[in-house]
Amino acid sequence: MSLDKTTIAKRYSKALFEIVSEKGQRDETRAELNQIQQVFNDNEGLGKILTDKGLEQNQKLEILNILTKDASNYVGNLIKMTFDYGRMDYLTAIIDEFNNLCDADEKIVRAKVVSAIPLSDQQLDKMAEQFAKRLKVSEVVLDSEVDDSIIGGAIIKTDSLIYDGSIQTQINQIRQRLIG
């Protein structure tokens, strides 16, 4: 039975998370992984190239050596292991899952706020602070997006929760009540 990408990413990230947490190197590892992820984001298709059967093994190893040249042992071993198992195109998913584990451990929630007009930094900070209190977490990190179709108010979305305070939704609710 073949495992899906998410299952594999969760297994690899959990193992790495446990090791670096035990060794007190979680923050450094997280920063390092985010740099690696940026390289993959800036070079779209890099993971597929490193798993492509058409590319010579020595060419793949040259790219791999560049990626791991300044890497810590743990990150270097993770990259080499994903390469050895032909899963380099899973690396960004593994890093995402590692970041999710770090956020959960630190009680950080990442959310997207959608508003009809651009929000100032002060408004975002206040909104994040209030939402963190409501969720009983240490911090809410908001990513802001503008959508004028909501008319006014805001919608805050996390992975597991949607708080919809938009005028458009309120209008729809009133309409439904009037219709019966």
UniProtKB/Swiss-Prot annotation:
Record-linked InterPro entries: ATP_synth_OSCP/delta_N_sf, ATPase_OSCP/dsu
Locations listed in the record: Cell membrane
Membrane topology value: Peripheral membrane protein
Main location: membrane
Keywords carried by this UniProt record: ATP synthesis, Cell membrane, CF(1), Hydrogen ion transport, Ion transport, Membrane, Transport
Subunit structure, interactors included: F-type ATPases have 2 components, F(1) - the catalytic core - and F(0) - the membrane proton channel. F(1) has five subunits: alpha(3), beta(3), gamma(1), delta(1), epsilon(1). F(0) has three main subunits: a(1), b(2) and c(10-14). The alpha and beta chains form an alternating ring which encloses part of the gamma chain. F(1) is attached to F(0) by a central stalk formed by the gamma and epsilon chains, while a peripheral stalk is formed by the delta and b chains.
PANTHER family membership: ATP SYNTHASE DELTA CHAIN
Annotated family: Belongs to the ATPase delta chain family.
Protein name: ATP synthase subunit delta
Lineage of origin: Bacteria, Bacillati, Bacillota, Bacilli, Lactobacillales
